[in-house]
Structure formats: structure tokens, C-alpha cells
Amino acid sequence: MTSISLNLIMAFSLALAGVLIYRSHLMSTLLCLEGMMLSLFILMALLISHFHMLSVSMAPLILLVFSACEAGVGLALLVKTSTDYGNDYVQNLNLLQC
């Protein structure tokens, strides 16, 4: 395993640990999710170029598109939550309320 792959796997695991540790605020959770998606994108692009897999060469771009959609929905949820409640606590996102 090269040092670049190891660094990207470490970045992914640190972002995952950030999601698990800083889950009280929505903004920090969204930033950690973006870090996870970015490290997955770079790792996937490097692995595809290293192994010359042309059949799945569009997969990193598709992952990047889904990451952008996730960021847009997350920011819309953040704006809606902060205008309704005045803060960005995840505990305000109770899906059982009607």
C-alpha cells in the first residue's frame, strides 16, 4: 500500500471519527461528511488510474455528483433548522414530529 493510499484511508477514518464524535452540531457533521466524500473521490480516482480500469472510469464523477447533491440538501436543511430553532443542533431534527 502506498503512502498516498494510506493517507487517504487515514483521512477517511478521521472524518468518520469526526462524524461519530461531533454529532451534536449539524454543520460539523456536514463538514466531516464532505471530508469523507472527498477522500473517497480521490482514492477511487487514484485506484482506477493505477489499475487502468476504463470500464468504471466514470464512477468518481458520479460520486462527486452525489456528494454535491448531499451538500446542497444538507445546507438547505441547515438553513431551515437554524431559521426555525436559532441553532444547528441535530437533536432538533426529530423525524417523529408531525
Swiss-Prot record:
Q: How does it sit in the membrane?
A: Multi-pass membrane protein
User: Which Pfam families has this protein been placed in?
Assistant: Oxidored_q2
* Record's keyword annotation contains Protease: no
Any single GO CC term annotated in Swiss-Prot or TrEMBL for this entry: mitochondrial inner membrane
Give the residue range of the signal peptide: none
Q: Which cysteines are joined by disulfide bonds?
A: none
Top EC class, one word? translocase
Question: Superkingdom of this entry's organism?
Answer: Eukaryota
Quickly give the catalysed reaction.
a ubiquinone + NADH + 5 H(+)(in) = a ubiquinol + NAD(+) + 4 H(+)(out)
User: Localized where?
Assistant: Mitochondrion inner membrane
Membrane-crossing segments per the record: 1-21, 28-48, 59-79
Keywords, ordered alphabetically? Electron transport, Membrane, Mitochondrion, Mitochondrion inner membrane, NAD, Respiratory chain, Translocase, Transmembrane, Transmembrane helix, Transport, Ubiquinone
According to the UniProt entry, its GO molecular function terms are: NADH dehydrogenase (ubiquinone) activity
What GO terms describe the biological role, i.e. biological process, of this protein? Answer: ATP synthesis coupled electron transport
Enzyme Commission number(s): 7.1.1.2
Partners and quaternary state? Core subunit of respiratory chain NADH dehydrogenase (Complex I) which is composed of 45 different subunits.
PANTHER family reported in the protein's UniProt record: NADH-UBIQUINONE OXIDOREDUCTASE CHAIN 4L, NADH-UBIQUINONE OXIDOREDUCTASE SUBUNIT ND4L
**What is the role of the protein in this entry?**
Core subunit of the mitochondrial membrane respiratory chain NADH dehydrogenase (Complex I) which catalyzes electron transfer from NADH through the respiratory chain, using ubiquinone as an electron acceptor. Part of the enzyme membrane arm which is embedded in the lipid bilayer and involved in proton translocation.
Q: What family does the entry list?
A: Belongs to the complex I subunit 4L family.
Give the protein's recorded name. Answer: NADH-ubiquinone oxidoreductase chain 4L
User: Lineage, please?
Assistant: Eukaryota, Metazoa, Chordata, Craniata, Vertebrata
